[in-house]
Amino acid sequence: MMSASNLSVIHEVLLVLLNHQRINLPYENLEASLSRMLFLSSFVQEVVQVPIPCNVSANRSVSGVYSPGDLVWAKMEGYPWWPCLIYNHPTEGTIVRGKGSSARIHVQFFDVSPTRGWVSIKYLRPYKGSSDREVLKGGMFYSMKPEIKKAMELADDAMSKDKTKRLELAVCSEPSDTEEAEEEEMEQMSGSASGDSDDSNSEEDVKGNKRVPNRGSAIKAKRRRVLDSDSDRDGSDVEFKPDVKEASSEEASSGVDENEATDVETDEESIEESPIKVPSKRKRGNVSKPSKRSSLENEHSEAPKRAAPVSLEAKSKLTLFAAPENFESQANACSGGTNGFAAWEHEKLEWLQEGKKKDAHRRRQNHPDYDPCTLYVPEDYLNKCTPGMRRWWQLKSQNFDAVICYKVGKFYELYHMDAVTGVNELGLIFMKGSWAHSGFPETAFGRFSAILVQKGYKIARVEQTETPEMMEARCKATAHTTKFDKVVRREICRIITKGTQTYSIIDCDPTENHNKYLLCVKEKEDSSGQRVYGVCFVDTSVGKFYVGQFSDDRHCSRFRTLVAHYTPVQVLFEKGNLTVDTQKILKGSLISCIQEGLISGSQFWSASKTLKVLLEEEYFKENQNTESGCVLPSVIKSLTSESDSLGLTPGENSELALSALGGIVFYLKKCLIDQELLSLANFEKYIPVDADNAKTVSSSNFFARTDRRMVLDGVTLMNLEVLQNGTNGTTEGTLLERIDSCCTPFGKRLLKQWLCAPLCNPTSINDRLDAVEDLLAVPAKLTEITEHLKKLPDLERLLSKIHSIGSPLKSQNHPDSRAIFYEEIKYSKKKIADFLSALEGFKVMNEIVDAMEEVASDFKSQVLKQLVTRKAKHPDGRFPDLSAELKRWDTAFDHNQARKTGVITPKAGFDPDYDKALQDIKTVEEDFRTYLDKQRKLLGLKSVLYWGTGKNRYQMEIPETATSRNLPEEYELKSTRKGYKRYWTKEIEKMLAELINAEERRDAALKDCMRRLFYNFDKNSQDWQTAVQCIAVLDVLMSLANYSQDGDGPLCRPVILLPVDSAPPFLELKNARHPCITKTFFGDDFIPNDIVIGSKDEDGGSEASCVLVTGPNMGGKSTLMRQAGLLVIMAQLGCYVPAEVCRLTPIDRVFTRLGASDRIMSGESTFFVELSETSSILQHATEHSLVLVDELGRGTATFDGTAIASAVVRELAENIKCRTLFSTHYHSLVEDYSGSAAVRLGHMACMVENESEDPSQETITFLYKFIEGACPKSYGFNAARLADIPEEIIQKGHRKAKEFEKKTMSLRIFRFLCRVVDGVTHDANAVGKLTTMLSHL
């Protein structure tokens, strides 16, 4: 904190700056803004004696444009637009000062504590309310600041009143003692604004001549010109020296509060030719509120005493804080014309115009191979640029699709089109100049980059990788240097996209727990004409890769399932390789996903090139299998040819998979995260869930395999709302939300994977159910463990982050290892905090296992017992023994000290290199002491001492009187002082060299200590990851137990029976409820229902595998079908279900054809979507599948729809014989299958009151009860009445329906009679049926 005296000094300096030097400093958070300007105190006594100009009387005239009580937007220099009320000055009784363009209006700023001031009429705009389009994003008055939003609320309230009432809001009546000084400043500002042309000419003097002072301000300090911010001088790269305490030019130019990074402006750089390099003050706009300014001035009502003029030295220091001459350049991003010029400079460049752009290979935009990620920048243009801007264009030309965050000192600068993006998307403001320029501090990078990435932008972080001293040394070592060499090196250290976020130390922490996959896909047809996919996808925050290759059907069913289970946020594909069907999936199902095409060969590598790069780059050197001698991970090795021991030849059915991996590796390499992710060697082979689902496989053998999973494709997950709802895409109302009470992020991710692929093996399912029962049997432990789990951080991501920091590969040649960060200490502290957080997390895991081991012996579940049993105690235990390792890390270094200082000093015995260096230092120092004692005895003088520092240490200082004797010849005179001489010997030089070497080794070990510490921790990664996996499973099991205990209404343990070949599959649910719906729309309790398929119910119904469901519109048919689907998923997940009885044989796949929607982005109509989904069912369904079909055929003509529905029912019921719920409103279909043994009829019951020919008189009460038999009508006119269809239309429709019914019935009677005449049927039943049909006419 600043002392009161320092603050007082700075306040007085501010007054002088404001009244005399026209300096514009931010007033918000004064202490933070001025914390780096304390050096002003050295000359403040000289500054505060500057005479203050006398007040100039104002010419008062009434404009007539505005009147008291008007509401306006007002803008003062350095402040955002602010809602104001115009009212008469409390002492002058007028609203206007001056006349013409120099007139100023008196306003009160709306705020919690209102303030007032005079504002130039040029900077007033009528206030039209907070709903005005100029207030919205992109408008002139748009702001994200809560203060301005609050001010708009007050202004909106004032708008509803008349002017008389509004004037009662004017509460600022006391005149300010410093008001006249403020007015003088505003006069100068207005004069400057009106004379921009003169100032701009002076500013753009390319020869750097002295600035000509204004005649009216002779006392104003003469200054060298400060050039526009589009210039980059060699000195601009000298401003950042983290190890130098004295403020640099960059720091001196930045009087901003970095915590308010949204509106921070970046500093300007002078060009190389400027004779005096004066960095201009970093202007802060849209930050301070007028109220703060006024309150600051009121605190200092007395003006400084008049005294001698300020000295030249003081003036030169004050120029460091000079504001740009024209604040009009800070204008809205969307209108270049409001910035004092027609367009931004980059908008005028011909080679940047649409239609004229070329890529780096000079291919135009209409060329088929045009690369939009690169840009051709003419060489003659680059030669005209300053060194810094030339480097920016070089980087931009290779990353044209990225927003370049260009490090200058401690700020990230955005230039040209990137600056416009920053203003539009981040709310930054432009700097002065004719070209777009904005920026933010280093500390704000994580927050701002996350916003841009979330909006789909690609970010390129460019760091300064050379200090000014290093640059000078490089230039000296180079024979011929140009001005382009005399600039510090800057390199791209990271490219961040939505699919490549790793949440490093400089990035912000993740806000979401779910996986974000980067998917790479390659496609081709095999020799049989079948579609084949090669895929590779990775969650970069965890570092786990999935690689696989599979064949697919014409509907791309497996690929659709993949993207549903592992939803990518970014997709890479080979340009010109994808089929139309795959492109439709990318444009339809993955429309919100970022998609990027890679060029075949150079970017999307072949399988052979991929293997070659993986071996050459030595990504897996640390993980090399010493026994087999294999460098490649086992999963990658399995994809190579068995005949090639080197692993350079792809396997027969693995070329596409390895090529897709190559696309991923290329992209990770481009984003500069290939080393940290691939060196984890965390690969898993992707095998489609339905890979072995074949109709010829014995059902008992199939379900006996523990690795079998239920297949839930993307359509089913969407229709049943398992992961996200169909309304807004969130988890609200989904099965995931209902059962997810996981406490850890990695547990939540695992639960989602379990939901996407429930178990099929009854033994495994029952073991999970046993685990749920075991946990429910120890409620006290359940509560205790829950509290422990809540303390765990996201250890899965932390382990990946620790590996990245400790990676030797990254430390050797990654640009980030050379980057110079201003906030290095802050980042070091964050690294240590993350590491200590991981250690604490594993300690908590140990406590969890200790607590569970006390009751583990009573557990029936094998999986639960294995999770909480240590390997060392039982051979079946899975949890690693971490106690010894954790104790080792507890004593490795002082945790509290490291957390405070950001520096790790290892304790003895932990770091061999550091310990050896310390031991050598100690040994040499002891040798020095021994040698000194020896020399004392030799000379007979006890007063001989060592003297010196650094490399001149250990000079023996001998009294001059003693040197007159014969000294040994080996003594070499090094220095003298009065009465003494100092000597070295060869022995001393040798020992000193040893000491310096040991000290250098110690310092190097200490400097690299954190990385090596993380690296050593990562060596035990297998145990750490195993522990995380065990606790993740425990967390999910506890989540299932919580639902099983706290679910609404009665819940039961499902009974899963292994199917018998002689018996049909069945599903039996008694009094079952929808798991996500506890109340009806009207607030009543949910009505439970029985669903029996494939077995007889209590009423003795048939064992039909297909149930035809009818009932009134809105009667609950779709809900019943969704309920059945969700309950079987829960049962095979290993969770209790909301029912009194749940018995079933395992279901291998759930199919759904629910709802009605088109795929407009894929060019598919509603009916086509229906038939596509139905086709997939008919192709892939087995007798062990569950099929849910809702109103098939409604998307086409009635007869066509009826025919298709009838054929599908017959196929499902008589051929496939799978468990089916088929809802329909085609009552002819019901009649056709009423006598079929393979089909059972059921309907949602309803009660009809006042049934009559007039539908308006009927009252339908939905009972939501599923009962045996068919429903006679669909009562569609009741739904029409509930939807407020006009009564007249309903009546007409009812009459028309009667006509259709009669015609249809007549036709059916005619056909029946024809059959009787032909002798096809003529029994008593036929006669009875004919009689019934006639009664309906």
From Swiss-Prot:
GO BP: any one term: negative regulation of DNA endoreduplication
Family as reported in the entry's similarity comment: Belongs to the DNA mismatch repair MutS family.
Protein task: Component of the post-replicative DNA mismatch repair system (MMR). Involved in B cell growth by positively regulating B cell proliferation and controlling replication efficiency. Controls cell cycle to prevent re-replication and defects in DNA damage-induced G2 checkpoint. Doesn't seem to counteract or control the immunoglobulin gene conversion (Ig GC) and to contribute to guanine/uracil mismatch repair.
Gene name, Swiss-Prot/TrEMBL: MSH6
Region described as Disordered: spans on this chain: 170-310
UniProt-annotated location(s): Nucleus
UniProt KW keywords: ATP-binding, DNA damage, DNA-binding, Nucleotide-binding, Nucleus
PWWP domain mapped to chain residues: 68-130
Basic and acidic residues compositional bias, start-end: 226-248, 294-305
Protein name stated in the entry: DNA mismatch repair protein Msh6
Signal peptide stretch: none
Compositionally biased tracts (Acidic residues): 176-187, 257-272
